[in-house]
From Swiss-Prot:
UniProt function note: Part of the high-affinity ATP-driven potassium transport (or Kdp) system, which catalyzes the hydrolysis of ATP coupled with the electrogenic transport of potassium into the cytoplasm. This subunit acts as a catalytic chaperone that increases the ATP-binding affinity of the ATP-hydrolyzing subunit KdpB by the formation of a transient KdpB/KdpC/ATP ternary complex.
Protein name according to UniProt: Potassium-transporting ATPase KdpC subunit
GO molecular function: ATP binding; P-type potassium transmembrane transporter activity
InterPro entries listed in its UniProt record: KdpC
Cellular compartments annotated: Cell inner membrane
One GO CC term, this protein: plasma membrane
Topology class, membrane: Single-pass membrane protein
Subunit structure: The system is composed of three essential subunits: KdpA, KdpB and KdpC.
Length: 183
């Protein structure tokens, strides 16, 4: 009976700790974060067009394309594909993405394509690409929008985020919003 009472106390304690105290602590911490933990929105003319930390699908030729998504940019189903580099289906999918990039960007060589442009991230919702991933698309964007290539390249360079730790990145949504404002 003593053991049963001890186990019951432990169960109630862990239930209160993990079902009440921990969620309230996380909620309190989130309230201290920018935008009270609701996510950092990107707005155009007062209308929210997306979130800074969640990738979106851009497939029109006059926009910069982001990283491929294993979940077709479905935030509710955030996940990677779980297919490794030895999986034949995965290799075929990566090759298809390479072929598509080479077809749309005939001036590129296979070796010019950065890995992040043909592989999905672990979350499937990565909002960023490498600066090289953006720069290889400059010629296509400039042609589609009838803009000076140097102007588009300068825009990309102005949107490169340098992290204290980790690689430089470019947020695709922020870049495309700025691109729409470019004249």
């Amino acid at each position: 009976m003593k053991n049963l009472f001890s186990l019951l106390k432990l169960t109630v304690f862990t239930l209160i700790l993990f079902a009440v105290i921990y969620p309230l602590a996380i909620y309190g911490i989130a309230k201290l974060a920018p935008n009270q933990g609701k996510g950092e929105t990107i707005s155009v003319n007062g209308k929210v067009v997306g979130y800074q930390k969640i990738g979106q699908k851009f497939d029109k030729s006059n926009y910069f394309w982001g990283r491929p998504s294993a979940v077709d940019y479905n935030a509710a189903g955030s996940a990677g594909s779980n297919k490794g580099p030895s999986n034949a289906d995965y290799l075929a999918l990566v090759q298809k993405r390479i072929d598509t990039l080479l077809l749309v960007h005939p001036y590129l060589k296979k070796s010019d394509i950065p890995v992040d442009m043909v592989t999905a991230s672990g979350s499937g919702l990565d909002p960023n690409i490498s600066p090289q991933g953006a720069l290889i698309q400059v010629k296509r964007i400039a042609k589609e929008r009838m803009l000076d290539e140097a102007k588009v390249k300068s825009l990309v360079e102005s949107k490169i985020n340098t992290a204290v730790v980790g690689p430089e990145t470019v947020n695709v949504l922020e870049l495309n919003v700025a691109l729409d404002q470019l004249k």
